[in-house]
Amino acid sequence: GLLGLGYGGYGYGAALAAPAAVSYAAPAIAAAPAVSYAAPAIAAAPAVSYAAPAIAAAPAISYAAPAIAAAPAVSYAAPAIAAAPAISYAAAPAIRYAAAPAIRYAAPAVARVAPAISYAAVAVARVAPALSYAAPALSYARYAAPALSYAAPAVSYAAPAISYAAPAIAKYALH
C-alpha cells in the first residue's frame, strides 16, 4: 500500500498520539487511522492529506498549495501534481509521460531522467518510487521501509517514506 503508515520517529515538541493515523496542527499532533496536514496542520484517513501546503490521500497522497493528490500515484498542485498509474507533467508548457506510480506536475518546472524525475522550483527529483519535497521539503520513499519526514513541523513515519521540508521534491528509488 502507498501508505502503510508505520510511523518512525517524530520530531515534535507537541502532543502526539498515533494508533493508526496522525493529525498535526502546528505543531500539535493527534492520531486517527491516517494523517492529515493543514498549514502545517495534518489530518488523514488510510492515506495522507496536506493542505497549505495541504496534502490528502487515500491509498495515495494528495497535496495542495503546493497541492498534491494521488491514489496509487501522486498528484501535486501549485506546483500541482496529479497521479494515475503513470506520470503526467503539466508545467507551462505541459509535459506528460507514463511511469510506475503516475504523477502529474503543473508549474513551475519539470525534468525527467529515466524512471527518475527532476522538478525544479519548487524542485522535484524522482528516482524510482522515492520522493523528496523541499520547502516545505518532502522526501518520499514509496517502496523502501516506508517512512515520512515532515519538517516544520517535522514528521517522520514509515509507510511510504516521505520527507517534507521546504518546497522541493526529489524522488529516489531505494532499490
Swiss-Prot record:
Sequence repeats: 17-20, 25-28, 31-34, 38-41, 44-47, 51-54, 57-60, 64-67, 70-73, 77-80, 83-86, 91-94, 99-102, 106-109, 134-137, 144-147, 151-154, 158-161, 165-168
GO molecular function: structural constituent of cuticle
Highest taxon, organism lineage: Eukaryota
Entry annotated with the keyword Repeat: yes
Repeat keyword on record: yes
Keywords of this entry: Cuticle, Repeat
Comment, domains: The tetrapeptide (A-A-P-[AV]) repeats found throughout the protein are also present in many proteins constituting the protective envelope of other species.
Role summary: Component of the cuticle of migratory locust which contains more than 100 different structural proteins.
Protein name, per record: Cuticle protein 16.5, isoform A
